[in-house]
Amino acid sequence: MTFISMTTKPLRPTLWIEQGQVFTWDQTRLPFEREVICLANSQDCARAIASMQVRGAPLIGAVAALGMAMAIREALAKHPGCYREAGWLDTLAKALLATRPTAVNLAWAVAQVSASVNAILQASTIDQEPPTQDLKGDRVNDSLRNRESKPTADSMATLLAEQAWQRALDLVDEDRSCNAAIGMQTQNVLMNNALMKHAHGHTASRPLQILTHCNAGALATVDWGTATAGIYQLHAQGIALHVWVDETRPRNQGASLTAYELADAGIPHTVIADNAGGLLMMRGLVDAVMVGCDRVCANGDVVNKIGTYLKALAAKAHGIPFWVACPASSIDMNCPSGMDVSIEERSALELSQIRGLPVHPQQTLRQPILVEIMQEGQICYNPGFDITPAALVSGLITEHALINPLKLREAFA
């Protein structure tokens, strides 16, 4: 993995590909250092996801897809005939799937790349013609279509590696367009919410007040974000709005990432302590809560960053809409409910230590440092996610439509 200082590069997009190489921000170094990492192989991709240099369900999915394509390319380069071995794709996927078990996008993206390769293997064995269509129904390029009817192991390996990489690139592009579409849906939801507020006596001159948790912004996706996509688009149209940003302990992704990217975009915002949201709602200072998610279960339960459930409870108590912005790929109809999700338990060090800049007046080189914030030996419990019951969710804002979480099975029937 290569590190590159890129202090002048725009923050968006979060991931880009140049000459076959994958680049993204090292999010563990933000907001104090803006550094790019180059993911050169499948191990780099797995390490970046596990270490949270790459985080956010959609971005994890994109990097996992690219990592799976790299793993396929690497395996075929080493042993061109390995595709004949039973379960070879499952073996290659294991390292990536083990990195972040809660995010359904990861497994979905890996499965998409694997399926594109399996489609070729099923349609083009040693004794059959190569396929003339890929999974999306598009005709494959001439160089692939004109291969011999009985391809060699080397030519088949090249074909499979090319197909895996192309499918991964398609998924990257799809994430970008998907989030833009979520933004359009979110605009309609938020503006309707604002009109309702104004109809009930709120002044039209007051900015639309949105509270968000963790980081479901552009940094959590290839571009735009999920929860922030509509915020970016409304801001670009000159709509007055203000965002309350939860700090989101213990990794402080709201304070260090969401606030950072909103500042970069010039969007008015205020960072608040995680426990301040309820008071703001009580005082009428929140018009809507907007979050992303790592998974939506078949019964409409939402799995998201720890602390989301408490925001949903407070919003329900004060009659404030609680929206979840997510791509359809985050909806897992194979998972019955939130109670069936494996919740990732993270290191106790995330609770006992905190990263920041020293503020000593004589400090000349202000480099980020880690400090202990509790007595050594304290027992810590650090679940990365919690479960928000479907009944607390006003709606799921996907790229296709606004969905009632209690009617999710009907929507996907």
Feature-to-residue mapping (PLM):
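Basic polycationic patches enriched in arginine
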Residues: 139, 145-147, 206
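N-terminal active-site beta-alpha-beta segment that forms phosphate/nucleotide-binding
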Residues: 51-123, 154-272
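Short, hydrophobic/aliphatic alpha-helical segments
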Residues: 37-53, 87, 207-212, 363-379
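Short, glycine-rich nucleotide/cofactor-binding loops
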Residues: 36-42, 215-221, 298-304
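Acidic-glycine-rich active-site phosphate/pyrophosphate-binding loop
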Residues: 33-44, 158-162, 206, 258, ...
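Positively charged, low-complexity intrinsically disordered leader regions
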Residues: 2-43
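Conserved phosphate- and dinucleotide-binding cores of soluble alpha/beta proteins
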Residues: 237-241, 246-413
